[in-house]
Amino acid sequence: MSSRSIRQASVLRRSSLALALAISLGGTGVVLAQSTTGNIFGTGAQPGDTVQISGSTGITREVPVDASGRYQFNNLPVGSYQVDLKRNGAVVDSRKNVNLTVGKGSDVSFNAAASAGSAQSLDSVTVTANSLPPVDVSTVDSRTVITSEQLAKLPLARTAEAIALLAPGAVAGSGYFSGPTGNALVSIGGGSVTENAYYINGFNTTDPLSGFGGITLPYGAIDQQEVLAGGYGAAYGRSAGGVISQVGKRGTNEWHFGAQILWEPRGTRSTPGNDHYIINGDSTSAGELYNYNKKDTQMRTVESAYVGGPLIKDKLYIFLAAEQERVNQDRYTSQDAPNYYDRTYRNPKFYGKLDWNINDSNILEVTGASNKQNYDANVYGFDYSTLTRGDRVGKDTSGNPLNKSGADLYTAKFTSYITDDLTLTVLYGKMHGTYYSQVPQTQTPHIITPNNQDPLLNGGSPISNENPTTRVFDPQHKSTNTNFRIDLSYHIGDHTITAGMDNQDVRDTNDGQGTSGPGYAWEYQKHDPNTPIAGAPGGSTYVAAPGGAGFYVDRYVYDARASVRVKQRAQYIEDSWQVNDRWLVKVGLRNDQFTNYNGVSQPYLRLTSPQWAPRLGATWDVNGDSSLKIYANAGRYYLAMPASVALRSAGQSLYTREYFNYTGIDANGIPTGLTPIETATGGPISSNREYGLPRDPKTAASTSLKSEYQDEFILGFDKTLGDKWVYGAKATVRKLKNAIDDVGDSDAITAALQRQGVDLATVGPIQGSYLFNPGRASDFMVPNLNGGYYTAHVTNADFGFPQLKRNYYGLEMYLEHPFDGKWYGKLDYLYSKSYGNSEGQVRSDIGQQDVSATVDWDYPQFMDYASGELSNSRKHVIKAYGSYQLADEWMLSGNVTVASGAPKSCLGLYGADESDPTGYGSYYHYCYGEPSAPGKVGHNPWTWLVDLSAEYRPTWADKKLAFNVTVFNVLNTRERLATYPQAGGIGAVDPNYRTTLYQTTPRYARFGISYDF
């Protein structure tokens, strides 16, 4: 859709493997949908013995040992456990400090060694004296788990996304996009940033409006975070990228409390370099200052505290954590809209958890969490000719970011161990979102692209005014997300069968935007004086040539607001089958149903036919001793449509431009001496026919529409290297098989009706955009003036589109040294390529956030030469991180990321003659008349990011007090991450082309002091 204002566990892990298999208790582990639990299993006991576990959270369970001497506990809350072997009621052997890792299992086998050291935690970072490098012989997915112990050591930014970037296949998303509270986003496995799912303690916290990130925990409240980058089971859905799941801390039988203060002073932060124009424009020159970054500064402070312990010992526990982040920024904006911003962010987070052990068989967990961002900024004018600050203009009411945003969530989870073989889990929760933005208190129209003003009329300097933004959000915007799920796990013989339902409902109230000021803005443009601005005479989007020197202005109007809702349902079943002592096979099937409603509660998308998503995985313990594992999996993953899609695709949207020549510009940047330019309508034009009329839900989407889905295939191995190392490799192939976007080519629909013999005089207004499946034939309902509808069957060839393509290929190799009491380290290299003509639901190169309503596929001209390397592709990525206990009181840690740059684009007018047949402007894959596929003009530079940290924990304070210093980007590299892609045309170049949009953050330091009791 047009957007020309775009800037705006199964878990039996490593065992000695004969154990991990075919035991009469099931012999296989289970990963529930929430993936918040772990397992304990083992062998070496005698038939008739029993095994009892006692957790730090008061959980006590006891199971009999089977005829083969094996036992297993499933779906245990993560934490520390003592495992006792009992014979005739007396404890004859014991293992202490068995720590569980989320989604994995711990092998606690009994033998002659009776010390706690014989407990081998599979893939846990808690390593005992006789532990071997972990090779997981039972899990078939691709996951990275980072524990609270690692988080306390590694030099990381305090966000879920910064943690996720440790996982192979995860790369930083475009700087255009951010999450609900301003956090940067990630792309996983070539997916767009909206294709990830977020969880807290099993509750889906993904942004319900557009899928941009999700709500996360305070950093100090994270017990474990897992990142699933592929191969995950049928319990997970609504994700085609990855899953970021956090498990929060809980109270134990001992009271603990602590606090931390972090400080990032201005004085330790290097200044970014200024940005300059790269090409000559009408009123700018190459080398001229474009963005005055040199004086940008920032200071950050973070205060956090926690407390946890028993309210009733062995029965009722509480854990509370709070975090307050404050950021002060000085920012100078570019010559496009020159201002100085004095910004303040206050970002509070809260987490609370109650755990009630009702009895040995039933547990109730209640979680509350809150994530907020409060933003305030004073805006001042800025004079680029003198580099001086001007008078205060007012508050920043642009809505980017929102002044108040975030969410509060409350969940309850009930777990019942009905028998030793049957476990029931029920989860219910709500998340309430707030999205408040101040509305500019001005009736002056905003000025868009003042750099395109006629320099003969503005004195050679762009003229704008105090209105800071084109669009404003509804200040009453709120949302409610309700999640209800049931999971049932049953062990029978060599099978563990898990089934469940996963329901989610979203209500999005007062969503959308309108134009600021008087309800319209002025957008200055330049075009070839003798070529139509848009379309051709007789076409529905025709706008005549501007004449003169090619300068013109359009009156921009946008209004798309509504209250909408989404209903999502899913059912799944999965079987973990231990075929023999070396083979484990997992077979799953998931069925999703999605229904999206418009502003008057009418369904405009009803994707409720069975959408079967098979999941198949297998692992082979080659040598039978957990030293070499070969694994593979294949699966299909469906993606739901978020709530915001309805605003333009099914709402009463208004999006027009009215074109004029002008002879003057007043002191507020408003054009004077207006003369209308001829258009097809004789007035305002909408490229997508968005004229503010109610949208018939039957004409919002193709009647043959199918959900977006992706197929994935993974093959890999893990191998021990001696007794201290493990290495491996993994190949991943992902193919987007079906996508949803909007098409605006109503002429092609009209032509199809004519071929079908329809009398065009009886055809009602055809919508300017329909949701459809790119690359596939579609059926569209069109109003019949005599009553009812016509159905237009339009093939892909009729539209003139290529086939949809998004293919991701990745080859990962890694070497890891598990923590041995002294040091831990991991080195990972990934070669990957993401190639095709569709990034997914959004477009990173132009920053388009209209989910499934991008410029792509609107008209065939946009898809010419659109196939190339996609924006989230990074061919080479090297990651290395770890920690080293230098001395008893000193610890060092580091995190290094080296990555090749993202592909660059050059977007211009269409074809060799540089026309604009759609009226969109410079969004075609042509660069000054030459075809220009993504990546053809090269890549951005490689980035080299080195972060180092040192901690001093003195023995004189009983190691409860710690002092820390972290330096980010030690090398102070300043590389471009993204550049402005729109080139304009030969006769009307865009002066911003190739200017820097985003660059790596310069070097800065963080100082910290913490106390833990």
Pin down the residues of each PLM region.
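Periplasm-facing N-terminal accessory domains of Gram-negative outer-membrane beta-barrel systems
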Residues: 29-130
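Periplasmic N-terminal accessory/gating domains of Gram-negative outer-membrane beta-barrel systems
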Residues: 89-91, 96-113, 126-250, 288-291, ...
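Solvent-exposed loop/turn elements at secondary-structure boundaries
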Residues: 173, 599, 606-613, 617-799, ...
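Transmembrane beta-barrel wall of Gram-negative outer-membrane proteins
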Residues: 256, 293-378, 401-425, 614
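Repeated loop/turn-to-beta-strand initiation elements of outer-membrane beta-barrel proteins
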Residues: 315-318, 361-364, 421-424, 494-497, ...
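Gram-negative outer-membrane beta-barrel transporters
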Residues: 580, 584, 594, 728-908, ...
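C-terminal beta-signal and adjacent terminal beta-strands/loops
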Residues: 724, 737-738, 833-835, 889-923, ...
